[in-house]
């Protein structure tokens, strides 16, 4: 057993209001520059829909993730090394700019410079940020399907409608929608790492964040195909691939990611998970796709187990990280309460951004007699959002974990309603789903009224373990822009150090 730590995230889809604040703040911080105008490290999609880029869940088209061969070994869906090499100069499975959208801005200056005597009102016309030319029509955007925008024929192409009678959902009274915020999953078994010909993508040992070395990247773009979530983008200006970096400078300082910090609905939770690195290959190679969710749970370790703590210390895990794992909201939701579920585990990448499935307005529907009752609780299989749709999205089609999560959230609500409204303790619903009163109270606290320090339990990094500090002693101190050699010469052979240096030692003339 080789223990490693990973900073994971849980998003509570039951509280997401689709405001796109996370997307905008992430965009402003990381991709508001030339070359990545079309890139959104974080975006919020409305489901059902084809998403961004278009039809990203269709792996028959894009060949992302892993497949299990007959001999039980894993191989990238896009092929082995020889097949990858054969496509290196012409990759047929790469999404084009039209699968994303042509980024644009508006000629706002025209509103100021238009002549006064014009018979028509001046307008700000769209202009392409790629060609610089005016666009006759905006064909697409990063959230083109927002709030079920578009006809049902296009929404019905959503891959999560597989094994569902989707024709009935084209009728207005049967429509449903939910928001799905997406970012890089920072997988335990990332396919992008395996498909990069340059070896530029790596997974950090201390926190599990997957990064692209910009010095090694050669722009082959195989990683874009290899990533089944299509969360790697090609910077056409620099010729490099870029992706969500999980705001690692903030994570190293013990702070949450930008998207988590600015989330209006407070739906995001960050925490540390300890896992057995030796068990990853065995879990990802599970034969039945529906078993992948449980196999990934088996990879995670109990941070309160004395044997796990002892082995973690031997493997170099700092004590502060172990303590953070013991308080991790991600561990509680994924492992203890089993409310959070992984996004498309059938891709076999073992994703580390998990989701709490959304509840439809089930109680009001039950009170109106539109839903049947299954004991104490309303029948969750009659939800407006089909359970099979959620299962296709979160558990490779297995409805049992989804039903368990929905019933537990519903039981918690039933218990708290009886406590706060009726003034009595009713544990029948909790007993039905296998929860204790203490667990129900804790679930309520985390999902409804959690404080900042409860939602984000992120230990600061230990730089002293990453780099020896002693050789830096008596190194480069303060200089006047002349490097570390201590001279104050005005000349430099390469004219690099002193080009912008300010001569602060010269005397200034007194003012008259």
Enumerate the language-model features and the residues they cover.
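Non-ligating segments of multi-cofactor redox enzymes
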Residues: 1-512
């Amino acid at each position: 057993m080789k223990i490693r730590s990973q900073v994971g995230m849980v998003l509570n889809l039951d509280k997401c209001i689709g405001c796109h604040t996370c997307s905008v703040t992430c965009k402003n911080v990381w991709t508001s520059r030339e070359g990545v105008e079309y890139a959104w490290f974080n975006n919020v999609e409305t489901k059902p829909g084809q998403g961004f880029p278009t039809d990203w869940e269709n792996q028959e088209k894009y060949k992302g993730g892993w497949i299990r061969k007959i001999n039980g070994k894993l191989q990238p869906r896009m092929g082995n090394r020889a097949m990858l090499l054969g496509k290196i100069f012409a990759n047929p499975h790469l999404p084009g700019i039209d699968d994303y959208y042509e980024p644009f801005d508006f000629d706002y200056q025209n509103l100021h410079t238009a002549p006064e005597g014009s018979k028509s009102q001046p307008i700000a016309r769209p202009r392409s940020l790629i060609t610089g030319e005016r666009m006759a029509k905006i064909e697409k955007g990063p959230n083109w399907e927002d709030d079920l925008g578009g006809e049902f024929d296009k929404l019905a192409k959503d891959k999560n409608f597989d094994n569902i009678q989707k024709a009935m959902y084209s009728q207005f009274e049967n429509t449903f929608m939910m928001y799905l915020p997406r970012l890089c999953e920072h997988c335990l078994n990332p396919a992008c790492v395996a498909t990069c010909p340059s070896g530029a993508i790596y997974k950090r040992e201390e926190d599990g964040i997957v990064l692209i070395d910009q010095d090694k990247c050669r722009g082959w773009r195989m990683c874009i195909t290899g990533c089944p979530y299509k969360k790697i983008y090609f910077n056409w200006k620099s010729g490099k691939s870029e992706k969500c970096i999980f705001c690692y400078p903030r994570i190293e300082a013990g702070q949450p990611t930008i998207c988590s910090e600015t989330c209006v609905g407070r739906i995001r939770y960050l925490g540390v998970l300890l896992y057995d690195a030796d068990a990853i290959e065995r879990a990802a190679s599970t034969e039945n796709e529906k078993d992948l969710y449980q196999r990934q749970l088996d990879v995670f370790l109990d941070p309160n187990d004395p044997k796990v703590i002892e082995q973690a210390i031997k493997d170099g895990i700092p004590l502060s990280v172990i303590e953070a794992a013991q308080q991790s909201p991600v561990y509680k939701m994924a492992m203890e309460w089993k409310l959070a579920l992984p996004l498309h585990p059938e891709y076999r990448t073992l994703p580390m951004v998990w989701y709490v499935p959304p509840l439809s307005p089930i109680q009001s529907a039950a009170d109106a007699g539109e839903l049947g009752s299954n004991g104490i609780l309303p029948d969750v299989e009659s939800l407006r959002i089909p359970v099979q749709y959620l299962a296709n999205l979160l558990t490779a089609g297995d409805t049992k974990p989804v039903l368990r999560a929905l019933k537990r959230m519903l039981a918690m609500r039933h218990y708290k309603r009886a406590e706060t409204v009726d003034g009595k303790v009713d544990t029948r619903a909790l007993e039905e789903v296998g929860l204790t009163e203490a667990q129900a109270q804790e679930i309520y606290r985390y999902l409804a009224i959690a404080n900042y320090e409860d939602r984000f339990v992120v230990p600061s990094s230990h730089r002293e373990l990453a780099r020896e500090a002693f050789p830096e002693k008596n190194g480069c101190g303060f200089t006047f822009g002349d490097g570390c050699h201590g001279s104050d010469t005005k000349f430099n052979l390469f004219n690099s150090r002193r080009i912008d240096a300010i001569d602060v030692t010269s005397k200034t003339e007194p003012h008259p």
